[in-house]
Structure formats: structure tokens, C-alpha cells
């Protein structure tokens, strides 16, 4: 009887230890998720910024990487990548460098196609069309004979102009990843097709699937803040060996050297 009591006490203690340890692990995961959300919050609070010229007056995170008189450059990038089954991968998007010192914005509309040769080696073909932004309008700086393409470029909208993350706090049960050695961090959430950002993407792009995407928030650099590293968003609709459909977006603030 005495022996049985000892076993019961030991097992009870073991269960309690596992439970407490489990709670600690869960709390740690929740804490890291909250930290990642906090890190992204300042960036995501800029969505939407309908007028791109507002970036001339937006301050970003500054550290010793910036020269004293450098106001910094915002680099925004949006692109849609589609690889249907049995077809080539095509990425269409734009990158714009918004220089706060010169109050000028230049970039490129980029079309990238990736195919594989008989040996399975990727063949990448890029076409870049230089652009500038004036009065919140995208203007090609070189002649484009293809009228349809020219219209696509002139009508292009960055995700920051229509995306909205005011409900970020409502995203729950994310898949959290953190590597302090790089450092890198990410949080991934399953969305549904009723999500406003998903609706906006479907409105603007021909997305050949009804599958709801996952949202990935991914970054590198110190979680407490750094101008070294990057942050980007990814809406992944389909991802496998035969088919890939996803949208990526980023807003980063960097020193203006070379921009």
C-alpha cells in the first residue's frame, strides 16, 4: 500500500511537471508570436498608404548604418508569381526606390520567366522596364510599344496602397519560427477567402485557384529593430513541386548610398 502511494505521488508529480513545462512552452511560443507581431506592427501600420509621395515624409528606423545627413530611402516591392502545372513560372511586379533626400522615386517593372532545359537546369529571363513616380503616378521612362503592357505598368498599384492589417491582432495560432543565430523570424497564418487582403489580391490579379492562402510574415535582423536585414510578406495560395502561386510584398527603409 505504501509502495502504491509512492508510485501515485511520483506519477502525479511527473504529470504536473509535464503540464507546467508544456504551459511554459506554450507561453514562450505566444510571447515570441507577440514579439514578432510587434516587430512588424510599425511596418504594417503603413498599409494602406494610397499616395506614394507620403513616403517622402515618413521616418523609418535609423541606426549607425545611416550617415548623419541621410534621410534614407524607402524601397517598396510587390510581385505576383504564377507557375501553373506543366507551364513556366512567371513573376510580374515592380520595385520602387523612394529617396527622401532628393524627393525622387525611380524603379523598374520586372517580368521574370523561369523554365527548365532538358537537363533540369533553370533558365531565367528578365525584362526590366524603367519607371519613375511623379504625383503618385507610375510613368515609364522609356518607350513601350506594347500598349497593353504600357497600360499595365501605368496602372500598377503596390500592395501598400490597398492592403490593410488593422486586424493583425486577430490572427491566431500562427506557426512561429525564430533563429537567434541568424537572426531570423517568421509567423505564418492560414487565411480564408473572406479576408479583405485576399479579396483585394483576387480583384487585381488573375489567380488560377480557389484555394485560400497562408500569410507569412518573415524577417531577418534584430527583433528589437535594425536597418540591416529585411521584412517581407507572402501570400501563398499553392506551393508544391508541380505548381506555385504566391504574392510577395516588402517595404524596407535603407541608407541612401547608391539609391
Swiss-Prot record:
Location within or outside the cell: Cell membrane
Similarity field: Belongs to the staphylococcal tandem lipoprotein family.
Membrane topology value: Lipid-anchor
Lipidation (S-diacylglycerol cysteine): 23
Stored Gene3D superfamilies: 2.50.20.40
Recorded GO CC terms: plasma membrane
Lipidation (N-palmitoyl cysteine): 23
Keyword annotations of the record: Cell membrane, Lipoprotein, Membrane, Palmitate, Signal
Protein name per the record: Uncharacterized lipoprotein SERP2423
Originating organism: Staphylococcus epidermidis (strain ATCC 35984 / DSM 28319 / BCRC 17069 / CCUG 31568 / BM 3577 / RP62A)
Signal sequence range: 1-22
Lineage: Bacteria, Bacillati, Bacillota, Bacilli, Bacillales
Amino acid at each position: 500500500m505504501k509502495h502504491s502511494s509512492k508510485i501515485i505521488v511520483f506519477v502525479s508529480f511527473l504529470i504536473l511537471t509535464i503540464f507546467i513545462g508544456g504551459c511554459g512552452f506554450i507561453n514562450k511560443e505566444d510571447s515570441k508570436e507577440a514579439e514578432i507581431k510587434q516587430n512588424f506592427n510599425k511596418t504594417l501600420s503603413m498599409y494602406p498608404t494610397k499616395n506614394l509621395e507620403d513616403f517622402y515624409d515618413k521616418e523609418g528606423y535609423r541606426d549607425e548604418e545611416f550617415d548623419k545627413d541621410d534621410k534614407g530611402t524607402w524601397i517598396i516591392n510587390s510581385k505576383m508569381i504564377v507557375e501553373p502545372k506543366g507551364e513556366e513560372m512567371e513573376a510580374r511586379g515592380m520595385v520602387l526606390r523612394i529617396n527622401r533626400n532628393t524627393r525622387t522615386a525611380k524603379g523598374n517593372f520586372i517580368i521574370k520567366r523561369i523554365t527548365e532545359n532538358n537537363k533540369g537546369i533553370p533558365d531565367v529571363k528578365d525584362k526590366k522596364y524603367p519607371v519613375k513616380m511623379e504625383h503618385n503616378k507610375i510613368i515609364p521612362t522609356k518607350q513601350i510599344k506594347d500598349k497593353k503592357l504600357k497600360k499595365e505598368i501605368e496602372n500598377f498599384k503596390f500592395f501598400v496602397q490597398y492592403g490593410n492589417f488593422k486586424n493583425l491582432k486577430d490572427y491566431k495560432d500562427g506557426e512561429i519560427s525564430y533563429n537567434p543565430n541568424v537572426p531570423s523570424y517568421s509567423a505564418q497564418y492560414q487565411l480564408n477567402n473572406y479576408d479583405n487582403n485576399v479579396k483585394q489580391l483576387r480583384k487585381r490579379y488573375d489567380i488560377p485557384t480557389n484555394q485560400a492562402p497562408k500569410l507569412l510574415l518573415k524577417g531577418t535582423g534584430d527583433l528589437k529593430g535594425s536597418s540591416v536585414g529585411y521584412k517581407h510578406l507572402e501570400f501563398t495560395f499553392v506551393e508544391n513541386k508541380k505548381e506555385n502561386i504566391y504574392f510577395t510584398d516588402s517595404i524596407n527603409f535603407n541608407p541612401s548610398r547608391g539609391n
